[in-house]
Curated annotation (Swiss-Prot):
It catalyses: UDP-N-acetyl-alpha-D-muramate + L-alanine + ATP = UDP-N-acetyl-alpha-D-muramoyl-L-alanine + ADP + phosphate + H(+). The keyword Cell division applies. GO terms for molecular function: ATP binding; UDP-N-acetylmuramate-L-alanine ligase activity. GO terms for cellular component: cytoplasm. The gene is murC. Keywords: ATP-binding, Cell cycle, Cell division, Cell shape, Cell wall biogenesis/degradation, Cytoplasm, Ligase, Nucleotide-binding, Peptidoglycan synthesis. This is UDP-N-acetylmuramate--L-alanine ligase. Cell wall formation. It comes from Campylobacter jejuni subsp. jejuni serotype O:6 (strain 81116 / NCTC 11828). The keyword Phosphoprotein does not apply. Its EC number is 6.3.2.8. ATP binds at residues 108-114. Belongs to the MurCDEF family. GO terms for biological process: cell division; cell wall organization; peptidoglycan biosynthetic process; regulation of cell shape.
Amino acid sequence: MQNIHFIGIGGIGISALARFLKEKGFKISGSDLKESKITKELEKEGVKVSIPHHKDNILNKDLVIYSAAIKEENPEFKHAKELGIKCLSRKEALPLILEDKRVFAVAGAHGKSTTSSILASLLDDASVIIGAILKEFGSNMIYKESQNLVFEADESDSSFLNSNPYLAIVTNAEAEHLDHYGNEVSKLHHAYTQFLDVAKIRVINAEDEFLKNYKNESIKLYPSKDIKNCTMCIENFKPFTSFELKDLGEFKVFGMGYHLALDASLAILAALNFLDIETIRTRLKNYQGIKKRFDILHADENLVLIDDYGHHPTEIKATLSAAQEYAKLGGYKKITAIFEPHRYTRLAANLKEFAKAFEGVDELVILPVYAAGEEPIELDLKAVFPKALFVEDIKREGKFLVASKGQVFEEGLIIGFGAGDISNKLRQKNE
């Protein structure tokens, strides 16, 4: 049995790969800088996890796979190289992991986790590797003895080009992670074209500015024409979106917002290649959402607290639109957004867009930037967000939130945005 060690195993994407290979019969170990919910869960699943990194952790290993966050000076990476152990980045390891599978890969700047998750609910015989926790299964990985595998493909480091898709879905091709592409949008778009070209079946959002010009044969969704009568409702505080798709009738999906209808439509059009429409309509009801995507942590008649992974203006704007609809349906009079900016480079590149995205909220609270390893960039955020409340920290007290300056947030709809620590802050109760 091959011994595989993962450096940075606590990451949402790389932990899914570790889980998948463990199910395939490999002996898995891993390490990370600090303990987390994911590392604790992995240990319960029988994975030996070492905290922090130490060179001895890679002794007697046949292969080392490391996350994108790992630098060359990492003691385990350095020692593995010295010992001649084969080292692969997550990106380089994908062909090895996916080699014998029929891959249904979902890419795009926004909506890929949701679209992947919905597709996984529809294709219930497929294994799943995604960068989010499916509430239906309580994991970012599902292993099935099947040739089919639903995979969330990442364009940020061009690793989606290593996914060898049988079916490829692209939700949109908005410019994100341009630093990896030499700040040239044309290189990013060329990568998307390569990703699509490899696939036998292609499903695209044909109203995306780039994708609408894609030349090869594909199944095209024109959201403004194909999605009709999109309505939202709340049932026992749970959000649902209903819509009609082309001439296929009505569908109902867990979650709130037009973007949910769009993501679900792409998954439905993909699944139609393998399933009949009534099976799809029924299985769509199994989908229960994903963690950190309009994730309702507490709800009663006076207060609803929501955690959302949104960290780009486009995502935030779409989710706030859904939040406004939820507040209207639920009778919540005030909307408070708590924003933890993720990466200085993203914040600096999209300052005006972020300001615009938050225009509809009654109160905006801004936490310090989650740097994700980046060097700080000097930004005058108070000039861009003159009405915002800037706080050093926020913590959960029972069902309420308390800011470091003493402010208490206890009514209306409160929604947190960010890809850093904010989710933990919103979830860690101090009773």
